[in-house]
């Protein structure tokens, strides 16, 4: 029977065959105690291409502190941000809606490939938020 209380990240960290994985995680600065905790992915659409997303770096830094204080291991990732403000009224607008799928795919790949236990996502606008909602 599957242990419902077992963290998904144990797929990456438990057992002799996962020694290389643990070594890789140690190279990121994690110690054995951290490796035993739940891994929480933090993904945002920070970028300097729009004023809407420029605060996301600070927000994610604060989220990181909260996750650590709560007993999790925060692991940051990022997704693209396409600004309608500067992409509209020219060929760039063709990429706005497409960016939603790209965002959704990249966030899913980041979380599933690394077997993270949880995801906290912050975005600045409808395109990015809807991308993850997809």
Task: Label every model-predicted segment.
Residues 121-125:
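Conserved small/polar residues in nucleotide/adenosyl-binding loops
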Residues 1-120:
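Metallocofactor- and cofactor-centric catalytic cores in central/energy metabolism, strongly enriched
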Residues 132-134:
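Hydrophobic alpha-helical segments, chiefly the membrane-spanning helices
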């Amino acid at each position: 029977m599957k242990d419902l209380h077992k963290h998904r990240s144990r797929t990456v960290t438990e057992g002799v065959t996962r020694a290389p994985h643990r070594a890789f995680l140690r190279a990121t600065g994690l110690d054995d105690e951290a490796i035993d905790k739940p891994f929480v992915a933090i993904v945002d659409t920070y970028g300097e291409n729009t004023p809407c997303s420029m605060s996301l770096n600070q927000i994610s830094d604060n989220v990181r502190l909260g996750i650590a204080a709560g007993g999790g291991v925060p692991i940051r990732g990022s997704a693209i941000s396409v600004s309608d403000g500067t992409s509209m009224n020219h060929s760039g607008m063709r990429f706005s809606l497409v960016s939603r799928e790209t965002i959704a795919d990249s966030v899913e790949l980041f979380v599933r490939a690394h077997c993270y236990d949880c995801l906290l996502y912050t975005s600045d606008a409808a395109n990015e938020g809807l991308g993850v909602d997809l």
